[in-house]
Amino acid sequence: MQQAQGLKRGLSARHIRFMALGSAIGTGLFYGSASAIQMAGPAVLLAYLIGGAAVFMVMRALGEMAVHNPVAGSFGHYATTYLGPMAGFILGWTYAFEMVIVAIADVTAFGIYMGFWFPEVARWIWVLGIVFLIGGLNLCNVKVFGEMEFWLSLLKVGAIVAMILAGLGIMAFGFSQVGTGHAVGMSNLFDHGGFMPNGVGGLIASFAVVMFAFGGIEIIGVTAGEAKDPQRVIPKAINAVPLRILLFYVLTLFVLMCLYPWPQIGSQGSPFVQIFSNLGIGSAAAVLNVVVISAAISAINSDIFGAGRMMYGLAQQGHAPRGFSKLSKHGVPWMTVVVMGAALLIGVLLNYLIPENVFLLIASIATFATVWVWLMILLTQVAMRRSMSREQVAQLKFPVPFWPYGPAMAIAFMVFIFGVLGYFPDTQAALIVGVIWVVFLVASYLLWCKPRAGQGQPVAEPAELHR
């Protein structure tokens, strides 16, 4: 096993670009959007626009730090540098926790999607199989991960664009009845209780699911340590975020809700598949099921990659067991991949014990972890700016826009989301679990890391360049 050699820079601009595209298209869109639609109705489009604006500010804050100092471990390392070791410890492990929880949601969605074709097969069997498959692939060279993400992302993007064009074609050419008795068109956005049928309360409630949908997009910052030219490719990837949000979330859900009455969109599978199946277009439903399965596989792949690299960075800083920093001959932190695979077996157990309730529970907990990570990223960027002179700020190659008002508004929005989780009964458990997790991390740091602080822990350095 390699220990002296660092992570390999095996991710090209093409890999990073499509990872940026693919990270916006996952379980939160293909499955979780059904719950968000039921909460807010067509007004969910506003929730995605507002949440997307806040997420873009998070990504720009992360991009400023990642371009300034591209390292393995990314924002966990930045938090240690600018907010202190405890903050880095809490942020790094909360991100790893987020990836575990999100991955459990993703493997659960994979099992649900497979039920479209094989309803008689127990879901936990599919979950177990995909955990072993993706875990094995992540033990390969990082280029294998990059290539897999490239092709899966290409498939997802192509399918979304094709679905949007097909939906617009159905509306434009008067394909208003497909044997279902339902009208097709923009009238569906207003005919079933209005554009905001559940009021402002429904719109606010949907933020818990909407923010979960954006979770994982920060993986672009984690890839900085393995990107061949981070100062060029990361800004391009991050600046494409607003367009991706408009295309993949707002326009996509707009078309879906125009095609089919939103009150009849259920949660027994992907709403994308349901709508085309109910419209009588069975072949399109089958193709879309392949796409959503691919999206779930891609998301699981990214989850394992992101958590593994964060734990590797934590180990370099002395915030995780030293074994997590061991590399295979392919330059992969193999121990962290094994740990992630073992953690995902919890998902297998949950799908065996409570198959009907597992997704909502996991998604709400993931929302807490996701928003906590974003809040810490924003606070870290503010702390970095405060530590810099005017000359240093002027030399930043990718500065955050609308400083300081943009980051301040994004910070306030993240705090607001915590309030949403605590206010609505369905998500209160997530806030409780999240608070317990943070308290556990604080206690763990004080008992484990702080006594060793004077022993001189290794510091994360930029990954070595291997072309």
From Swiss-Prot:
GO CC aspect terms: plasma membrane
Keyword Translocase: no
Outcome of swapping residue 218 to A/Q: Loss of activity
Major localisation: membrane
Effect of residue 156 to A/Q: Retains less than 10% of wild-type activity
Gene Ontology molecular functions: symporter activity
Disrupted-gene phenotype: Deletion of the gene severely impairs growth on histidine.
Pfam families: AA_permease
Organism domain of life: Bacteria
Subcellular location: Cell inner membrane
This protein's UniProt keywords: Amino-acid transport, Cell inner membrane, Cell membrane, Membrane, Symport, Transmembrane, Transmembrane helix, Transport
Gene Ontology process terms (BP): amino acid transport
Effect of residue 212 to A/Q: Loss of activity
TM ranges: 18-38, 39-59, 71-91, 99-119, 125-145, 155-175, 200-220, 245-265, 280-300, 334-354, 358-378, 402-422, 429-449
Family statement drawn from the similarity comment of this UniProt entry: Belongs to the amino acid-polyamine-organocation (APC) superfamily. Amino acid transporter (AAT) (TC 2.A.3.1) family.
Function: Major high-affinity histidine transporter. Binds and catalyzes the uptake of histidine into the cell. Functions as an histidine:proton symporter with high specificity for histidine.
Protein's UniProt name: L-histidine transporter HutT
Originating gene: hutT
